[in-house]
Amino acid sequence: MCDTLGVLRGSYALFGKNSDLSSNEAEVTELYPARIYDGDEVACTYRLIPQAKETLSVLLSRPVWMWGAEIGVNEAGVAIGNEAVFTKGKYGA
């Protein structure tokens, strides 16, 4: 299980997350520059979605096998981190 931390104080924000990967599992860190697109679609895991016309630069980190990102932050300071959710409830209930 991963741990995520978020702290807000005044006009400052702190975000932290660990990945809980095996010591032998590779993690990739990638910097994507801001771009302007002309209406393409993006292939996500299970569907196509419209591509935003303009994107901000973003720094992302993920295990090599993952599509997308596990941890990241864009040039506007928006941070993301994914978490597994474990439940004893029935799927779809």
What function would you assign to each model-found segment?
Residues 1-92:
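A contiguous strand-loop segment
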